Amino acid sequence: MLSTTYIAILILALLSGLTTLIGVALAIYFKKNIKFLVIGIGFSAGIMLLISFFELIPESVKAAGIVKALIALFLGISLIALLNFIVPHTHLVKEKGRIDHHLIKAAYLVAFGLILHDFPEGFAMANSYIYSPGLGLLVALAIAIHNIPEEFAMAAPIVLAKSKSFLYKTAFISGLAEPAGAVLGLVAVHFFQALNPLFMSFAAGAMIFISLDELFPMAKRYKKTSLFVLGIFLSIFVYLSLTILIPG
């Protein structure tokens, strides 16, 4: 039988993954309102970087030493960068106000990219929770928050093409990739328990890359710097609140 810890991890991963549906729903509701999106991007980038640098990496260094932790961090960044190169995680954007069948065709490639990019997030969640339930909950919240503006940005152009059913199906399948990643994380921890501190640093590398490579350029594209900074400040406030409310 599965332990309560494993069940809790899988439920957290599933709930976090399914926040992709919220991103799609907001894209349908707000459509061309990008102010909400830019604040969300800033908030998402801030919360993921804060948890990576102030939670995951310090815990990894404390348990495994700085050299091993940095190597694992580099490997995490490198693997996601390679994955991003092989399957580019492109956010679809209208060109000159036109939407055509080429956009929908490209959407399938984006959907595939979303699934592959969500997989390591589930892995990060599982390893963090095994090390500390409080830390795991923080990571789950960070990933859930990150999913919303990311899916919003992906979905908004296709909403204009009136492909809502495709969007929800894509978001749902993408969300299921996180529990799948969590299962992989649990298997890794079960068979390689001594490596769990390194898995956390590895996961931090993945989260840092996602923030810097996807969220920051996405915000730059919308040219709303003040709203992006507002989102970052909100993330700091929420992060500090969560560290007080959620026990380690």
Tell where the protein language model's regions lie, with residue ranges.
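Intrinsically disordered, metal-sensing/regulatory segments
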Residues: 1-248
